[in-house]
């Protein structure tokens, strides 16, 4: 079983979990009006380029929730790193535990913060284990995590196999500065969709990510011009785009 399926399994010493409930964050993905299907479905990006997607994975971390009184609950760091993998349905519903209350906002990072990027490998467990769950989300040559990965094919790609690969990482660097592609996502809940958790009461937050926004928004990204993007300046353009790919669909309180 993958360690990133439920934060609640990673109790943090010194925190009282007796009056806590679960919040499930349910991720779905679309390409415009179409549900995302990996493999054979053809989509068209805002540049008019046809493409197919074979992989979509990204880290979420540093999750927090804001109550109606304005106070903020930050999920303990050792319990808030997840890999969202569209090909693995079990990864699309990470679970966190929070104190009872009503929450009007949530926030999370797409990526892995600089502290965890620089910790000793022995302290990177679960979703952060570069020899396990994060094996294909880690640059061994750069000692850093891939925050967001989208791969596929397109007839306009200049690559011999017509592939495209977007592997976006970089946290600002340690001894030498780099681009910082860590992005914070802020989600506001409408009054009818406030998260209400309490004793024997859990909630599910439904979020939708539109992959077409990876190609547009602040920056126009053409597969013909940018078929492979990794640790290059164009990575910042893609990160700025996917920072706006998420919308809140609804909240259920059970």
Report the location of each language-model feature.
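C-terminal motif of bacterial Sec signal peptides marking the signal peptidase cleavage site
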Residues: 3-6
